[in-house]
């Protein structure tokens, strides 16, 4: 509905994550005015080492004012679960300046898939004067080709600064040596 109302709707999906989704599904979205791109399409027989360079981000930005980020996939089975697979996940709603960082992460990925550099100020509206809090938020991203281990460095810093406790939860616990050292 929103694309038909003139709202700019952009979608990046991971080609491997949507392996079983037929191309016609995305074509119908494009026909409805949604700008849709696959992140690093995998085509056979060109199966290379880059097949594992996937986009695992789950984020959404609305009008540059509200952002959602976390672990929830967009599919009914992740909302309702089923008898064989129940899901527990965390997703955050963010308002204020932190939304700019979520949007920046999306627009960097957008440049990667579309080669369109989106820099217009309309995408970064002024933060509402009604948002008053003392919260700090930092959005940290990673990439398999980035020389900067930002997330790992963030974990190390958090662990080293802890004074009373640290809670960590992850489905994939494959820590680097610096993270293990900091945990000890």
Language-model region placement:
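Charged, low-complexity intrinsically disordered terminal segments
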Residues: 1-184
């Amino acid at each position: 509905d929103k694309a038909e109302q003139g709202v700019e709707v952009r979608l990046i999906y991971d080609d491997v994550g949507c392996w079983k989704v037929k191309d016609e599904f995305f074509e119908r979205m494009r026909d409805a005015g949604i700008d849709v791109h696959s992140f690093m399409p995998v085509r056979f027989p060109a199966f290379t080492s880059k097949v594992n360079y996937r986009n695992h981000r789950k984020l959404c930005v609305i009008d540059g004012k509200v952002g959602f980020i976390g672990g929830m996939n967009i599919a009914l089975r992740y909302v309702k679960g089923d008898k064989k697979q129940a899901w527990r996940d965390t997703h955050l709603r963010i308002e204020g300046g932190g939304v700019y960082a979520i949007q920046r992460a999306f627009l960097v990925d957008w440049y990667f898939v579309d080669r369109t550099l989106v820099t217009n100020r309309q995408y970064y509206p002024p933060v509402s004067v009604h948002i008053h809090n003392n919260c700090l938020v930092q959005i940290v991203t990673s990439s398999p080709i980035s020389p900067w281990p930002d997330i790992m460095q963030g974990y190390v810093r958090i662990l080293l600064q802890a004074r009373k406790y640290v809670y960590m939860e992850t489905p994939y616990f494959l820590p680097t040596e610096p993270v293990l050292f900091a945990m000890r």
